């Protein structure tokens, strides 16, 4: 039940014991003998040892799958690349401090490393960045030959559909990798201050884990004690070396395979207006998925003075078939210029 379910307390909780399992206080978890799901299982069911659990599952309905498909197809049509990788560079603990972005828990990838990785991948593959934060990838990004997609999607089930339709996932210690596992997708996961045994799927055939913190981290006893010394010790655990960046890129390329150009024809979805209307409003897949086209402000764009990301999910222009049709399209573009214009700073 959702916590706002009517009479949830009166009908289902009041006559029962109310338990609050704490997986981070399970001995097997903080000694790297089980993962988070197994720790919950032990705490809830009073087990002495972890047991093998079935793989997580996410069941998407048809509207979610359609929304994800349209978003990915639109990205392909704009970037002209047929293979798509979703990149989730940051975890929930990422913070924007003035012109900088940092993760005090060292679970997110370093910004410099992320930019290097994406700039290499975007040359051959379509890249969708799964992040609420906008950050520049390079100088003069507006003029870059290879653009990336930054859809601001608030519904995590739509993100699940995007990951499902995409060809590969690249992420850190965050929810994206678990979505990829639940959907049987391939994934490259970069970990730093946390242990793969606790938070990921080491040894799984579809997962490549790049352990940047191996040999230079200690377990952070979250929800048990506050240990500033450990946090300081782990401070550099997610700083990626050139060799580790190469490992990440090579893993993605191996999983994605040989790049190829997009040869399909993307038809933008249209949402029907009121029944009395004879015309339908033009909306792209991103808007139909619940996203909002908002210009980034100073609070959402780190590093003031850097170029604003120029990629918006716009509909590809159809080639005219004759002169009269061409003139008609020109008139249409004049009247609808704002809807089709790529953002410029």
Placement of each model-derived feature along the sequence:
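Core catalytic architecture of nucleotide-activated donor-dependent transferases building glycoconjugates
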Residues: 55-131, 135, 244, 267-270, ...
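Active-site and donor-binding regions of nucleotide-sugar-utilizing enzymes
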Residues: 1-36, 158-161, 176-178, 341
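Residue-level detector of alpha-helical secondary structure
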Residues: 76, 122, 249, 253, ...
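Intrinsically disordered, low-complexity repeat regions enriched in Pro/Gln/Gly/Tyr
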Residues: 271-315, 319, 323
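Basic, mixed-charge low-complexity alpha-helical segments
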Residues: 319, 323-345
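Donor-binding and catalytic core of enzymes assembling or modifying cell-surface/extracellular glycoconjugates
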Residues: 100-197
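Active-site regions of enzymes building and remodeling cell-envelope glycoconjugates
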Residues: 1-4, 14-17, 22-26, 140-153, ...
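Leloir-type glycosyltransferase catalytic cores
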Residues: 25-74, 203-276
